[in-house]
Amino acid sequence: MAPGQPQAIPLRPEFILPQDGHTKQDCEIAAAKRWLEKNGATYSPLKATLLGDDLYSHQPFCRRTLRHDFHFIFVCKPDSHTTLYNWVNLLQSPHRRTLTTQVKVGAHFHPYTYRYANAVPLAEGADALTVNWFELTATDPEGKVLYRNGWVTDFPITDQNVPALAAAGRARWKIENENNNTLKTKGYHLEHNFGHGKKHLASLLAAMNILAFLYHTFLASPSPMKTISSSAPACPPAKPSSTTCAPHPLYPLSQLGCLVRLYAPRL
């Protein structure tokens, strides 16, 4: 997936299921780790960028993402990352920078304010992973806050690329609209009753629906092969993951590659 691109292409899913030899209940992070182990070698040559919510923006998973040669843009909330935000709040210019732009929304221009800082610790400790943090606050012309969110990434951040990084971070919601919503409301009937089968029935039915959606996405594309080939050289990754390998229409960060969102659909 990518900002400005209508398609969201599902990749091979990794289901949250009890694992052989494990006594603990399976979870989203454990499934994401398995997805990386199974699929990392396939997608890392695309220089793909993993998108995810605050669940993923913790040191062990960020390190694992980098070991598999992926980039990442993960949501980073103040309540769950107190060390990072304490560090950011102590920084002053030029180590913490602010950029304000005007974005046309309908008939009006809305102020978009970006704050960012490079090389801040993600956690406590001398061996803490250093990441780059950025935040977007969108307001209406009267100053009312319409949207605010923060992320961490391994991409170095500048005035030139921070708007595109924020657009990429926000693009993960395309999965809710173009993928999940379509599967649940547009004839695929991907619903909670898929969880009532025994053994592998639920996973099989869900996988068949995801595969059907993938084929329909390519068949609906004016040039299905161009969707793939045009992205390979500079293509902005998990559990069922979704991507459209396409150049970002807004900015020069071709190194973002494909954008792949890590998420757990609720069936």
Which residues does each predicted region cover?
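Short acidic-glycine loop/turn motifs at beta-strand connectors
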Residues: M1-Q7, D140-K144, T185
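Conserved, well-structured functional cores that handle cations and Mg-NTP chemistry
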Residues: M1-R63, H68-F70
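Hydrophobic, well-ordered secondary-structure segments
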Residues: P13-A41, I73, T82, V88-Q102, ...
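Conserved active-site and cofactor/substrate-binding residues in soluble primary-metabolism enzymes
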Residues: C27, Q160, A202, A206
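Short, conserved catalytic/metal-binding motifs centered on acidic residues
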Residues: A32, L50-L55, F72, W151, ...
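An anionic, glycine-rich sequence signature occurring as long contiguous blocks
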Residues: K77-R172
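A short, flexible helix-boundary coil/loop motif
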Residues: T100, T113, K184-L267
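Short amphipathic alpha-helical "interface-anchor" segments enriched in bulky aromatics
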Residues: D159-F194
